[in-house]
Amino acid sequence: MTAHLDDATLTHHLAQSTADLLKGIRNVGALRDRALGDAGDDLAQNWIARVLEQHRPDDGFLSEEAADNPERLGKDRVWIIDPLDGTREYATGRQDWAIHIALVENGVPTHAAVGLPDLGVVFLSSDARAVSGPYAKRIVVSHNRAPAVAHHVAEKLGFVTSPLGSAGAKAMHVLIGDYDAYIHAGGQYEWDSAAPVGVCKAAGLHCSRLDGSELLYNNKDTYMPDILICRPELADDILEMA
């Protein structure tokens, strides 16, 4: 019989163990580039799915790397996972990739973990604190498709925009004060933001759509057009400008 793990502990263990696995296969050096990324996606997905099947067999499951099962829509508890957020960054040796683990209950992330393995840290909703103090005067954006609205907001605030890889990495760098806001308007899916939002909201950051509406998860359509994560004192100004 396996030991019972509470939700917070299971969330942490999933993120940390997946980080260890992904760093392990990359450090072997037998694969590189796309082959390494594909292997990382598969390994992380299979590991997380098997652990959840054993420890939370009655919960729903939504992952970027698995076929969607509509049965999740009838469940109050759903795990929303991105096993490897930033596959390209991982495969090319960059540090801005992440692991997203979120338990969503009735549409809201209640337990979340975002692992940044190359930085040796897992951020947890159960122990999250946002940095306060002087502004960094920087807004983090996608390095693939930085939205025009982010540049507009940055100009109005006297800030600059700066690109970074995975959504989890961007959100966590707002949390630790390297940036003041993360603005994305190019479209994402629920697994891109459920865990980062769970951690950032627990830490006291503002998290919403760009129209100010609440971010809700476990929808039939998992597409999410835009997102804002920022220091709470900047939220009203950014939402008005956006």
Where are these regions (language model features)?
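N-terminal subdomain of lithium-sensitive/metallo-dependent phosphomonoesterases centered on the IMPase/IPPase/PAP
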Residues: 1-84
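Hydrophobic/basic alpha-helical segments enriched in Actinobacteria
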Residues: 10, 18, 25-29, 57, ...
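Residue-level signal for inorganic ion chemistry
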Residues: 18, 22, 52, 61, ...
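Short loop/edge segments at beta-strand edges and connector loops
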Residues: 63-65, 126, 165, 211
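DPxDG-like acidic metal-binding loop motif
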Residues: 72-127
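Flexible hinge/capping segments at coil-to-helix
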Residues: 127-137
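An extended, acidic
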Residues: 135-242
